[in-house]
Amino acid sequence: LQIHQSLTIRLQATLTLMSGNQVKRTGISSLWASLTGGGARRTANGSKAARGPAPGEGLVARHLRKSYKRRPVTRDVSVSVRRGEAVGLLGPNGAGKTTVFYMITGLIAADSGTITLDGADITDLPMYQRARLGIGYLPQEASVFRALTVEDNIRAVLELHVPDKAERERRLRGLLDEFQITHIQHSPAVALSGGERRRVEIARALAANPRFILLDEPFAGIDPIAINDIRQLVRQLTTRGLGVLITDHNVRETLEIIDRALIIHDGHVLMEGTPQEIVANPDVRRLYLGEGFSL
């Protein structure tokens, strides 16, 4: 029965996710691994030029470069995230921020540079192996298993990570309560609103105990009334001690929930700092935010 359930869940994942853009890039097995994760334990602190982790700690990308047909897309970009903080990767369309984000997730390979997780080099690891080490990834596209209920979406991941049934159900109840989705636990995922779907996706990602979560356009497809839900979810993640890396085109909403931001412009880091420092920087205002922007 358990084998049958596992196969059913994997088949449903395949059918549900085949329309997503990320599947075209990574294949079903890699995206499944990115959603189920894997993972463990520690991180750290740091200071200015990378006000994130000190060397050997946290999720750190150094000197990333990527070109397509000899056209440089990113030039010497370094990004760091420590546990318990949210970092935003922002910039104009075509600036290279999405390329940087995808190099960190493992969706695309860097031409040069390194990516480390708590000091361990993961630069050459595929996406699914990064997931096993504790890097969770939520794509922009809906990734819920639509034919499953809310609780079965989360249980599907717990079955891969928690052998004991009683402990599995205890963890399930805890995640349903923490993300305030107990009242919809028996609802089919296909019937969820945008905000509810994001709650379920994040709860399911946490079932795998990741150290870091990478959020790709978390505000996309979300009604204005649900934006506050996303803010609360990110706060919950950092309060749990997870590091969060966000890339999104919704600048104001992103700046309101992060601790630090990096502004990518023309393939390099134009500015790194707190949201207040970012907004006050004249170059950032001139090239990206606009002179009238305010938080």
Predicted regions and their residues:
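The feature captures the beta-strand-to-loop junction immediately N-terminal to the Walker
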Residues: 90-92
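Helix-to-loop junction immediately C-terminal to a conserved catalytic motif
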Residues: 105
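Conserved ABC ATPase "signature" region
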Residues: 166-184, 235
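Conserved ABC ATPase signature
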Residues: 188-192, 196
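Conserved catalytic motifs of ABC-family nucleotide-binding domains
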Residues: 209
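Catalytic Walker B motif of ABC-type/P-loop ATPase nucleotide-binding domains
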Residues: 213-217
